[in-house]
Amino acid sequence: MALPSSSLSSRIPTGPHPLTHTQCIPHFSTTINAGISAAKPRSFYLRWGKDSQPKNLGSNKIIACVGEGTTSLPYQSAEKTDSLSAPTLVKREFPPGFWKDHVIDSLTSSHKVSAAEEKRIETLISDIKNIFRSMGYGETNPSAYDTAWVARIPAVDGSEQPEFPETLEWILQNQLKDGSWGEGFYFLAYDRILATLACMITLTLWRTGETQIRKGIEFFKTQAGKIEDEADSHRPSGFEIVFPAMLKEAKVLGLDLPYELSFIKQIIEKREAKLERLPTNILYALPTTLLYSLEGLQEIVDWQKIIKLQSKDGSFLTSPASTAAVFMRTGNKKCLEFLNFVLKKFGNHVPCHYPLDLFERLWAVDTVERLGIDRHFKEEIKDALDYVYSHWDERGIGWARENPVPDIDDTAMGLRILRLHGYNVSSDVLKTFRDENGEFFCFLGQTQRGVTDMLNVNRCSHVAFPGETIMQEAKLCTERYLRNALEDVGAFDKWALKKNIRGEVEYALKYPWHRSMPRLEARSYIEHYGPNDVWLGKTMYMMPYISNEKYLELAKLDFNHVQSLHQKELRDLRRWWKSSGFSDLKFTRERVTEIYFSAASFIFEPEFATCRYVYTKMSIFTVILDDLYDAHGTLDNLNLFSEGVKRWDLSLVDRMPQDMKICFTVLYNTVNEIAVEGRKRQGRDVLGYIRNVLEILLAAHTKEAEWSATRYVPSFDEYIENASVSISLGTVVLISALFTGEILTDDVLSKIGRGSRFLQLMDLTGRLVNDTKTYQAERGQGEVASAVQCYMKDHPEISEEEALKHVYTVMENALDELNREFVNNREVPDSCRRLVFETARIMQWFYMEGDGFTVSHEMEIKEHVKNCLFQPVA
């Protein structure tokens, strides 16, 4: 793709989309300044090397270090210099390309996808489709704790039997070998002790299971002390409320437990302190998370008042335990209906909360998207999101559709995913979770928050639209929290026990939304994703439709399959580069691998192979043309080259130097080939369209060449106006768009064309991020125009640091606007919208820390290229 070394651009005009040839080309003067020979070179550049650093000798001189000697050149800060003698051209050299054939051969995997693997991919896709299609109220595992509370309920007919005898039997049959109750594959002392205590009390109340009780007591005595070694962040929700209350009950029942353990005393003290701070009027005023733990508040609850806060489904915040406690106190029929509803689903046990329908759908969609396999499930994803959106609330959502207490975790996840899929959702929903100090918390009016929910808020904050200050506040707040969490091992995590949440946080902070690419995120998340992750509610629970081995298996097979296709395409493109004679061009950069990587990082799907070829070839041309017009060609020769493109006349190459002859001939032949294929795809001739796109680019390069020749520093606005073309990104995108699998009408092309705000923002953000990382080096090479320098010219009173800050502000605001264009431009096919938006993102990624295009081999970028293109996932 086009990643020019010279700087150009800032504010882009927003006029209507021109369609005709004469309308499309901006009016760029090709008249050479009177005092300058058009046949002489226009600029000087430093040789590449550690000793070739520019030395500033004041406002009027720059010395270029070239070999053993130096070249002193006048530096003019005036707008134009009419009598400037042409400076001597010093050959510019780039660092050599890292990706030589032997390097690529040593990295390329010999693995080929077998027929059995292809069959397995098909099977997994079918299985996962069935997972999505079977989503109802949520799939989850049994909660021994909640089942014990439901088993307590006496028969409503007055007999001395449990209302749900099957739950009592489940407790008797599901004690673990160590005497505890809970999930056997994962030991969390908090969870096991809580569930074991609840089951022992229930068995004691029904005077059954003496053997199980005895084993449970033994477990409690030997293992309870381990709680002191566990992080506070692993303490289940409401533990300090329900555990002391049950201990008190156990003591009354005569269970022989170590009530004097220090941690037990500490938990009791925490409960008392919390209840002292609890205004009773709040308990009944509106739904809060206290409804989730009413079984631990029985001595203070006014049961008639609390009934007013019952959910529509009859539950109390979807908790079977809390609902069972209310039923035993009130006999409320809706409570009983809810419990019957849950048992009808699960048979002889209940989960820790139910339903989980919104949570399940959102996280399943997020999982397949982050793993890079979402393209296989477009219909299923739409159905899931339609369901979530139908239950969206401007106050936020919780984990279930009728949950009266919204949480920031589900709300932020929903806001981000729904917005990116084109649903109309407002960021104002986050205001529900912001306190008077500007801090964000998981639940309204509480101070609880964890790493996972703050991570989701942070991810959400990056899809902001212009003017959404709440998103900016959320970004700053969560970045601060997450960076502190990385320094505090105990901060991981209040709501989930994940395989590598730390790795997820590190990736999100280093590669936020505008600096991450789909293929890179997939590679990273494949490593971080845990198919056996568990969540923490009142007890530990699992979500098999979110954490599932099948997702991971498909992601790995699919990644490696696509990677093998990419390796073949890259070999083809490298052969094309060599056969074209480009290796003989010493004035330009050989970056075939980096350019192909930029395309494969986002348009990676097998069906877009032709688009990747075109994107890569056109990007290579724009780099060559940029280097040609930027420093190598004389103005006479450049005008001849531009005339050749305008006339589309191969005979003009006879008047060109050899290097230009190579460039023009290969451009001519390649564009003709692309046009033939484009005609097949679009059903109409596209050669004129492609030539027009190229003419516009060369006109912009010509203007830039004139600026360089005359040492002219344009105003910020003038600089930006030309940058909408000279950045070259639009050239690549507008031609590649013809191969995205859609028939593009003139109307659609206008919505991504030169006059569209969408394309302008892509160009603007790409140019500005380039300038922020290259302007100093290019200034040392004699370049006089960049966003920073032009803004300083307009505002001579400001410092360079202030100018740079302004450029960053313009860019960040433009990225927010780009979000809005990407999301709302629904008349443009998805593949075309992606092409524009992801091209903007790859620029942010390449220039995140420096000039990652020119010197990628010296940066972390090299490892990402390896991971994306060469190293299969295990």
Curated annotation (Swiss-Prot):
Pfam families, per database record: Terpene_synth, Terpene_synth_C
Subcellular location: Plastid, Chloroplast
Transit peptide, residue positions per record: 1-37
Domain of life, source organism: Eukaryota
CDD domains referenced in this protein's UniProt entry, alphabetically: Terpene_cyclase_plant_C1 (cd00684)
Domain notes: The Asp-Xaa-Asp-Asp (DXDD) motif is important for the catalytic activity in the class II active site relevant for the cyclization of GGPP. The Asp-Asp-Xaa-Xaa-Asp/Glu (DDXXD/E) motif is important for the catalytic activity in the class I active site, presumably through binding to Mg(2+).
Binding site for Mg(2+) 1: 626, 630
Name of the protein in question: Isopimaradiene synthase, chloroplastic
Annotated region described as Disordered, given as residue ranges: 1-20
E.C. number(s) listed in UniProt: 4.2.3.-
Organism (species): Picea sitchensis (Sitka spruce)
Family: Belongs to the terpene synthase family. Tpsd subfamily.
